[in-house]
Amino acid sequence: MYDAIVVGGGFSGLKAARDLTNAGKKVLLLEGGERLGGRAYSRESRNVPGLRVEIGGAYLHRKHHPRLAAELDRYGIPTAAASEFTSFRHRLGPTAVDQAFPIPGSEAVAVEAATYTLLRDAHRIDLEKGLENQDLEDLDIPLNEYVDKLDLPPVSRQFLLAWAWNMLGQPADQASALWMLQLVAAHHYSILGVVLSLDEVFSNGSADLVDAMSQEIPEIRLQTVVTGIDQSGDVVNVTVKDGHAFQAHSVIVATPMNTWRRIVFTPALPERRRSVIEEGHGGQGLKILIHVRGAEAGIECVGDGIFPTLYDYCEVSESERLLVAFTDSGSFDPTDIGAVKDAVLYYLPEVEVLGIDYHDWIADPLFEGPWVAPRVGQFSRVHKELGEPAGRIHFVGSDVSLEFPGYIEGALETAECAVNAILHS
């Protein structure tokens, strides 16, 4: 019998299991895969032997991500500044300026008016209340419709749409304007804060922090997929794929939201919550690391290509670099190397593409999706409730974070809440 069973070994599960263990609780962590870390996934590059790369979450900002900063300090995990952008090759229209902020002076007044509207709408969001509790349905519309209402000139319109595509992992007709505004609110109500959070990276990969946290958890079982959680009796029974069952007083579900529909909950979860879980969120974000020859250090490209953003990741050799591109898996097939080359050459016709590296999070049955991005109309219907306890079952992870959804910080935030709830129950 355990005091708590934690299902899932990403950062939320690791923090929950570690903190409960350090509070004197007997804890079992069950992870379905062969590794810990979840969507924070550092491994050797498939193209550059000996080079460690981040296939999943990679960036942090100490001001915006204080819990993650505290974990790094706790274990002495080194970080480095993210690649500084010093050269710009945008495709935003003939009047765009090739610099970090490419908006021409002729569009400044329109950008000022649109910025006012964006910040006004973002300030309607109280991060603690949940999007379903604030009468925000009028903002939960397709992003392209919202941007149309901003009446932006061509360059600033495309600049906004490109970065939104990068951050949300959805084309504008499928993305929710409310979710874009939620990200602005999460970054201290700063539009630039969303982009400037790409500030630091793990010097040696996120696995350093994963390994350090896991050392404080005595009992971890890998390749143990949970199929059922039954709290109808005096204790909570957790059943795994091979039929074995474990018992605990409390359970923390720390797996991605899109996998919860594969778990049989007894009794069933509340209907309103269950409907969104069955649908799954609509995130399709695709991060591709591209090995190239002939690219400048510090290059940044933003534009109307199938890669809305393409920028420097790291040096490989004097003439070779890794670039990172963002798009979505519904719009682009990363297995089509010809399409990858065309997408890169659209911005950088002088470079040679040598190889690509990525992880298909949607096809991976342990994730069934990348970082969270709701379908239009989902989170104004059910949002905060997704992360609320259901009896003795607690739900954590960056997918259900109110403060920092989609970030490691959000995973740590939700774990903190669940641990406090269990310790004070």
Swiss-Prot record:
Q: Which GO terms describe its molecular function?
A: (S)-6-hydroxynicotine oxidase activity; nucleotide binding
Keyword tags: Alkaloid metabolism, Cytoplasm, FAD, Flavoprotein, Nucleotide-binding, Oxidoreductase, Plasmid
One example of a Gene Ontology biological process annotation? alkaloid metabolic process
Q: Which InterPro entries match?
A: Amino_oxidase, FAD/NAD-bd_sf, Flavin_amine_oxidase, Flavin_MAO
pH-dependence of activity, as noted: Fairly stable between pH 6 and 9.
Q: Where in the cell is it found?
A: Cytoplasm
Query: Which GO cellular component term is one of those annotated?
Result: cytoplasm
Keyword DNA repair assigned:
no
Its cofactor is: FAD
For this chain's record, the cofactor binding note is: Binds 1 FAD per subunit.
Pathway this chain belongs to: Alkaloid degradation; nicotine degradation; 6-hydroxypseudooxynicotine from nicotine (S-isomer route): step 2/2
Record-listed E.C. numbers: 1.5.3.5
Coiled-coil stretches: none
Effect on the protein of changing residue 166 to A: 30-fold decrease in kcat/Km and kred for (S)-6-hydroxynicotine, with larger effects on the kcat/Km value for (S)-6-hydroxynornicotine
Q: How is its activity regulated?
A: Inhibited by (R)-6-hydroxynicotine. Inhibited by high concentrations of phenanthroline. Activity is strongly affected by Hg(2+) and p-chloromercuriphenylsulfonate, but not by N-ethylmaleimide and 5,5'-dithiobis-(2-nitrobenzoate).
A Pfam family recorded for this sequence: Amino_oxidase
Explain the induction of this protein.
Answer: Induced in the presence of L-nicotine and D-nicotine. Expressed during logarithmic growth and stationary phase.
What does the UniProt record report as the effect of altering residue 287 to M in this chain? 10-fold decrease in kcat/Km and kred for (S)-6-hydroxynicotine. 6000-fold decrease in the kcat/Km value for oxygen
Q: Where does FAD bind?
A: 12, 31, 38-39, 56-59, 226, 398, 406-408
Subcellular location, principal: cytoplasm
Q: Which residues bind (S)-6-hydroxynicotine?
A: 166, 311, 326, 371, 407
> What is the recorded function of this protein according to its Swiss-Prot or TrEMBL entry?
Involved in the degradation of L-nicotine. Catalyzes the oxidation of (S)-6-hydroxynicotine (6-hydroxy-L-nicotine) to 6-hydroxypseudooxynicotine. Oxidation of the pyrrolidine ring of (S)-6-hydroxynicotine leads to the formation of the optically inactive 6-hydroxy-N-methylmyosmine, which hydrolyzes spontaneously to 6-hydroxypseudooxynicotine. Acts with absolute stereospecificity on the L-form of 6-hydroxynicotine. Can also use (S)-6-hydroxynornicotine.
State the family it belongs to: Belongs to the flavin monoamine oxidase family.
Q: What is known of its domains?
A: Consists of two domains, an FAD-binding domain and a substrate-binding domain. The inactive D-stereoisomer binds in mirror symmetry with respect to the catalytic axis, revealing absolute stereospecificity of hydrogen transfer to the flavin.
Can you state the subunit structure given in the record?
Answer: Homodimer.
Q: What is this protein called?
A: (S)-6-hydroxynicotine oxidase
Q: Which gene encodes it?
A: 6-hlno
